[in-house]
């Protein structure tokens, strides 16, 4: 049985400061700025594609100049969360995407700690280990927060 995408909103429904924009999206009431999307995806091989669809469906028009970079970085961070941030590839990954007129900020929260997240610079050829080097090259800023839940975040200027 496959797990569906589950969208969640962190905005409490009775709070009048937030205007609901659909499942998992909200915006400060009366403004055109910052947009937040919170989504939970299953920690399985589909997770990077599901995460990219969040950017496609929710925020692509605001990120036109850097949407490709944003999707590549998101794919790498989510793939790392599936591979290294879950127990035997089971569980969920939570995406928190904040977008305003100046930047995209994404948090990818995983079940295990993210304390040892760093790019690999091994001189020996190996089949992987380039994901965080790609993140470092394309994101304007990125980092990790220990957990659990652990979090890897990145920021891309719009």
Show the residue positions of the predicted features:
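Heptad-repeat coiled-coil signal-transmission/dimerization helices
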Residues: 48-55, 132
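STAS-typified acidic loop motif
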Residues: 38-48
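Short acidic/polar alpha-helix capping motifs at helix-coil junctions
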Residues: 19-22, 44, 57-60
């Amino acid at each position: 049985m496959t797990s569906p995408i589950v969208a969640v909103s962190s905005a409490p429904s009775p709070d009048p400061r937030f205007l609901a924009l659909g499942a998992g999206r909200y915006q400060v009431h009366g403004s055109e700025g910052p947009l937040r999307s919170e989504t939970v995806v299953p920690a399985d091989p589909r997770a990077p594609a599901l995460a990219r669809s969040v950017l496609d469906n929710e925020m692509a028009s605001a990120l036109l100049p850097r949407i490709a970079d944003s999707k590549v970085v998101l794919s790498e961070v989510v793939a790392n969360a599936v591979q290294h941030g879950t127990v035997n590839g089971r569980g969920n990954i939570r995406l928190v995407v904040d977008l305003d007129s100046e930047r995209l900020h994404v948090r990818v929260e995983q079940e295990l700690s993210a304390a040892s997240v760093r790019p690999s610079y091994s001189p020996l050829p190996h089949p992987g280990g380039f994901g965080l080097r790609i993140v470092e090259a394309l994101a304007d800023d990125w980092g990790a927060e220990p957990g659990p839940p652990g979090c890897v975040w990145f920021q891309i200027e719009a």
